[in-house]
Curated annotation (Swiss-Prot):
The lineage of its organism: Eukaryota, Metazoa, Chordata, Craniata, Vertebrata. GO terms for cellular component: external side of plasma membrane. Glycans are attached at N60. The chain crosses the membrane at residues 155-175, 211-231. The gene is MOG. Residues 176-210 are cytoplasmic. It comes from Macaca fascicularis (Crab-eating macaque). Residues 30-154, 232-247 are extracellular. This is Myelin-oligodendrocyte glycoprotein. Keywords: Cell adhesion, Disulfide bond, Glycoprotein, Immunoglobulin domain, Membrane, Signal, Transmembrane, Transmembrane helix. Residues 31-145 form the Ig-like V-type domain. GO terms for biological process: cell adhesion; regulation of cytokine production; T cell receptor signaling pathway.
Amino acid sequence: MASLSRPSLPSCLCSFLLLLLLQVSSSYAGQFRVIGPRQPIRALVGDEVELPCRISPGKNATGMEVGWYRPPFSRVVHLYRNGRDQDGEQAPEYRGRTELLKDAIGEGKVTLRIRNVRFSDEGGFTCFFRDHSYQEEAAIELKVEDPFYWVSPAVLVLLAVLPVLLLQITVGLVFLCLQYRLRGKLRAEIENLHRTFDPHFLRVPCWKITLFVIVPVLGPLVALIICYNWLHRRLAGQFLEELRNPF
């Protein structure tokens, strides 16, 4: 009767190592690194800014969970899960201001666009990719600058005062020009008046001159007195009518 052959020790060891290698390779098959820009990204207040992020090695990230949040309280800036943007989980200050650019998501590359940048957006952002239970992330720094950061306070004061000074100078020059022209016209009219003066003017009766001067002055005054008396009588009549019929 032939005896059964037993497996040798080297063959068992090789099988064990091969099985271990398969397990290790399968466990590390889904691992990747998340890479973001090394230098801070700069943006001006009111502009748009784009925060790029990718995984290495590149792979299709359509089925992954991708998002941005802000430390230290993990406020959700934008979240992409199950192939859709989860707008309901955004922090209130970012609702309606973010957009995930997914043109290259098949290569593991995405970009977050933030519209209407505010000073409060300055600081750190964290981009993460999650594939099942495995997650990696990268930090991104955003610097927000004022469009007039190059202007010193003294220049701002000068820019505010300069238009007023220019307006005053312009008005003054216009006034001087008009005054000079009016003086010339007045001088010419006086000279013409002296040339065309009629000595018979003094023979006009004094009552006509008085009437010509007083009527334009007293006319409006008399009309005002008449209107006042009419209004006074009307109000007095209404008051008496109310006294007679109180209800």
